[in-house]
């Protein structure tokens, strides 16, 4: 499974990249706005740090506007992936952009049929939102499992990005379900490698070694 970092914080991206865990980055208008810097400046800096795909989202709602924006975004760096909302106009834009060789990430997917439509239109990535489905009492993980099955059934090339990941369980279940990618907020990463029993074990090892060293010294 590939890990994308769901943030536009350059310091956060640098810190987690040093661990060798970042395969790509996803952003959206909300995330970009939090940085208080020009959109282009932020995306270009992220692309200079991360070799993998960096998703940058269009703002327009009509296909022509999305395509126009996407062409500009794609010129910012070779690893830019254009994020497109899951709408009829979005599908039209994806179809056009795919023909031009511009990679796309169709976002805000909540049903298998939406994911299938995006994949058929030529999306490079499709992003089902787990946490938001859970928020309305639906099991988002069922969507991941069923989407993976449908893509495999028909040999569709789109990769599933498990998005709106809220906790470790989301990540682990998405991995078990065969999602290609998980995009994870920076705040969740430390919880993925930490466990109180690990800390307790290290403490015990050090305590035993200290006792052994003192004994040897005597």
From Swiss-Prot:
It is found in: Cytoplasm. The keyword Lipoprotein does not apply. The keyword Hydrolase does not apply. Pathway: Carbohydrate degradation; pentose phosphate pathway; D-glyceraldehyde 3-phosphate and beta-D-fructose 6-phosphate from D-ribose 5-phosphate and D-xylulose 5-phosphate (non-oxidative stage): step 2/3. One of its GO terms (cellular component) is cytoplasm. It is an enzyme of class 2 (transferase). The active site is at 83 (schiff-base intermediate with substrate). This is Probable transaldolase 2. It comes from Listeria monocytogenes serovar 1/2a (strain ATCC BAA-679 / EGD-e). The gene is tal2.
